[in-house]
């Protein structure tokens, strides 16, 4: 017979950001322990609220399944002597498996006879196993910043205040951090009280009666439905913000949404100035009309019921009014100083003690951005607009608005630039240059935004690597991986045919001209090429590229990001064709043999067989056209041209032996194969394909 199992860990208030990770850990750990302990079950659920974590296993077997296993021991010839008596090897093996030597039996494996022991383990009652399972579940949870409390050495998200552990209606007896397990849980902090749980099956129902909705998905759905219903009452809607919705879900136990109003005199402010305090500081949901225009309403979610809801509404409106009053003041004050005049104030803002001020950084970005525009062949007027964008891009960092609302950097700069009559390209570039701000964010679309964004991110990456700051494992405090991914994404989307090595060198020079010392350029180039190649690999894999396709392409380097991606695209298509098999076979055969060649160039006069003479002539005939295709980055046509050589290469291998005794002839043939490898490998090192 099966019973339900419940473990609830009651704590002090837990940060919302911990919840998703804990849910995954609890589920994975519980599944793992049940499998290891041979405990069958029907279903497994995990729960979290700000004051508890819980796991409910439905239909958990009352005892382990019995266990029978056949364990391989030594070979028969080592297990028995000439008289058939067990040797010390057999005796030791039997003893280790808990069986008698006479119980060993023989089985054949891969043509060799071995002795085996058959082990049988009777399943234990589940209740005997659960105290340790509960303890292991608790100690197996990990948090970003665990804490200690009282005089305990144990660390947890927040202090543990109660533990519920039930198997059916029976308490699972154990003690942890000075707390004895039991049936006593706690309801909502103000609306509920002590809750004596009768059985795991009634957990959700009993907790809901105590104003705790333990299922986070149920809470999330309730929040979303209430928000939509309230927005509809004023003819509006709420744009789905999963991050905000998740955060709100994990800071409440019993959701009640309410509609608040925004004072009309603040609606003239730029939309981000209104919505940022709402979302980032107050966790409110802005309400919009059907066209997406902001309405003078917000929705917030209370952790409680509808008691005194009017008073709660007024309190939230008052808090938002104070926030918006500050924002309105900052907005007025910031407009008194033109954006261009703020640039010089950046000299007093330290970017990094080893990398100078933000003003110095602006100059580096400005120089690099113009250089990129020039490398892309842009006319002088566009280069000027790129340079102007770079000059003003960081100016809003010293505004009152951005000082109080850092999330608005770039957004306010673009708005203030518009006010003083900067060109649209400059305003858009200022707005976009921080993009992508997070994983999955949009890339800049304007040329000013793209170029300044790449220059900004490259300066940050080169500077950080140059003073020895690199991401390690899961640690990346300067978000260098995200910035590198942004650089890769922008270059790919814009289709720039540009050398990463040259950009890194140009950025390095900018630091040197300001007297800022970095690690040697050669060391930086090597580290950064590897770093960007990892990011390129990640981006292309996300787009569906196979790992071995990327191995083949990236073995030839990724200095020109767009070209490497184009190669991967062509190779992915070509490897699916029937013609690719003989092509790759010819490449690999040529490659393996050419490795034995000396470094001398091919001299066709040393070739004697008609097949090799014809192949050498074909290589010369196609050399100029092939080089032109590679220069253009037309890898599909380059592959097609290289494919014309395959019949001639096959004819060569059928007609002659490469490794002949005549050293001059042998080296000529090996050099010829080396020339073939150079052309056939136009898409990558095909020997790395699985």
From Swiss-Prot:
Domain of life from the UniProt record: Bacteria
Reaction it catalyzes: tRNA(Gly) + glycine + ATP = glycyl-tRNA(Gly) + AMP + diphosphate
UniProt-listed InterPro entries: DALR_anticod-bd, Gly-tRNA-synth_bsu, Gly-tRNA-synth_heterodimer
Primary localization: cytoplasm
EC assignment: 6.1.1.14
Subcellular location as annotated: Cytoplasm
GO molecular function, one term: ATP binding
An annotated GO BP: arginyl-tRNA aminoacylation
Family designation: Belongs to the class-II aminoacyl-tRNA synthetase family.
HAMAP family: Gly_tRNA_synth_beta
Protein name, UniProt field: Glycine--tRNA ligase beta subunit
Gene (UniProt): glyS
